[in-house]
């Protein structure tokens, strides 16, 4: 039976990320859906005033999630039919899933929420459209 590999956002107390992870985890558990949650242990760092995240910490967190996913492909813990779900698809490095699917000869689906992006005029990542539009 297919399972979900859940890649949550890192917890940032002043944002919605802790609540969102709790809601998603509770739903998966109460629905008795088989899932593996990949939540790397990284040190909490202070977010600079005027920012809503710390970019280096975010990239470290997501990179460790992708590294764990790659290990799971290598050890055949991820199988065709499984689903990788992320609570935010705006996730640099997520294109690695297509790479892993191709070279590991697996059909693993990728899904998740896309809260905003370079296509959103009011989002700060609008300035990243030059490279982000092909990623999104």
Predicted regions and their residues:
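Glycine-rich loops and low-complexity Gly/Arg-rich segments
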Residues: 29-32, 108-112, 134-136
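Membrane-proximal helix-turn-helix segments that form the acceptor-binding/catalytic region
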Residues: 126-136
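Short, solvent-exposed loop/turn segments at secondary-structure boundaries
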Residues: 16, 123-126
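Alpha-helical scaffolding within the catalytic cores
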Residues: 98-100
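Active-site proximal beta-strand in glycosyltransferases
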Residues: 83-90, 102-123
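N-terminal pre-catalytic "stem/leader" segment of glycosyltransferase-like enzymes
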Residues: 1-96
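Glycine-rich, flexible loop segments associated with nucleotide phosphate handling
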Residues: 59-63, 104-108, 136
């Amino acid at each position: 039976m297919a399972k979900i590999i859940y890649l949550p956002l890192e917890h940032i107390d002043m944002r919605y990320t802790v609540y969102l992870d709790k809601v998603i985890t509770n739903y998966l558990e109460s629905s008795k859906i088989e899932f593996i949650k990949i939540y790397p242990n990284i040190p909490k760092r202070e977010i600079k005033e005027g920012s809503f995240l710390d970019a280096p910490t975010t990239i470290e967190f997501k990179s460790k999630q992708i590294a764990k996913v790659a290990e799971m492909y290598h050890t055949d813990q991820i199988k065709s039919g499984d689903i990788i779900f992320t609570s935010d698809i705006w996730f640099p490095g997520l294109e690695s899933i297509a790479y892993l699917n191709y070279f590991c000869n697996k059909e693993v689906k990728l899904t998740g929420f896309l809260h905003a992006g370079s296509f959103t005029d009011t989002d700060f990542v609008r300035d990243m459209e030059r490279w982000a539009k092909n990623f999104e």
